[in-house]
Curated annotation (Swiss-Prot):
The keyword rRNA processing applies. This is Ribosome maturation factor RimM. The PRC barrel domain binds ribosomal protein uS19. Residues 97-169 form the PRC barrel domain. An accessory protein needed during the final step in the assembly of 30S ribosomal subunit, possibly for assembly of the head region. Essential for efficient processing of 16S rRNA. May be needed both before and after RbfA during the maturation of 16S rRNA. It has affinity for free ribosomal 30S subunits but not for 70S ribosomes. It comes from Neisseria meningitidis serogroup A / serotype 4A (strain DSM 15465 / Z2491). Its main location: cytoplasm.
C-alpha cells in the first residue's frame, strides 16, 4: 500500500485569517479540534502534496484555525487555499471494542445471514439516533442502521460486515 493510500482526507483549507499566516479549516471530523491531535499534515491539491507541521491551532466561534511552521504571512497562507488535508491512517488513536472509524467501514462488503451479498459500504450518515450504513450494490442502495440489532459482525481483517437484513426489508 502506498503512502497516499494510507492517508485519510480529513477536511480542507477554506480560507485565511489575519496577516500572520493563520488558516481557516473546514474539518470533516466529528469534532473539528480533533485535527489538532495530529502534528503532521499532508496537504493535497492537483496531484501536488505538501507536508506541513502544525505550529498552533485554536477554535474560534466554532471555527478551526491553524498556523503551520514556516507559513508566516497572509500571501503564503492564501497559496494553500483549497488544499485537502490528509492524515496518515496509522496516526489515528486505537478504537475501543465494537467501535470503528467510518473510513475503515467504507468499502467493506456487507452480507446477510443467508450469505447474500448486499453490496459495499459507500458512505455512512448520522441520523441523531444512530449511524446508518449506505450500501450500494446490484440490489440498489440499501440503508442499514449501524446498531447491534442489525449488525452481527464486523471483520476488519476480511473487510466483511454481516447483517441481519433481508433483501425485502
Amino acid at each position: 500500500m502506498t503512502d497516499t493510500q494510507n492517508r485519510v482526507a480529513m477536511g480542507y483549507i477554506k480560507g485565511v485569517f489575519g496577516i500572520k499566516g493563520w488558516l481557516k479549516i473546514a474539518a470533516n471530523t466529528e469534532y473539528s479540534d480533533s485535527l489538532l491531535d495530529y502534528p503532521e499534515w499532508h496537504l493535497v491539491k492537483d496531484g501536488k502534496t505538501i507536508s506541513v507541521t502544525l505550529e498552533a491551532g485554536k477554535v474560534v466561534n466554532s471555527e478551526l484555525q491553524v498556523k503551520f511552521e514556516g507559513i508566516n504571512d497572509r500571501d503564503l497562507a492564501f497559496s494553500l487555499h483549497g488544499y485537502t488535508i490528509e492524515i496518515p491512517r496509522e496516526a489515528f488513536a486505537p478504537t475501543e471494542e465494537d467501535e470503528y472509524y467510518w473510513t475503515d467501514l467504507v468499502g467493506m462488503t456487507v452480507v446477510n445471514k443467508d450469505h447474500t451479498v448486499l453490496g459495499k459500504v459507500s458512505n455512512l450518515m448520522e441520523t441523531g439516533a444512530n449511524d446508518v450504513l449506505m450500501i450500494d450494490g446490484e440490489h440498489g442502495q440499501i440503508l442499514i442502521p449501524f446498531v447491534s440489532q442489525y449488525i452481527e459482525t464486523v471483520d476488519t481483517g476480511s473487510k466483511i460486515i454481516t447483517a441481519d437484513w433481508g433483501l425485502d426489508y
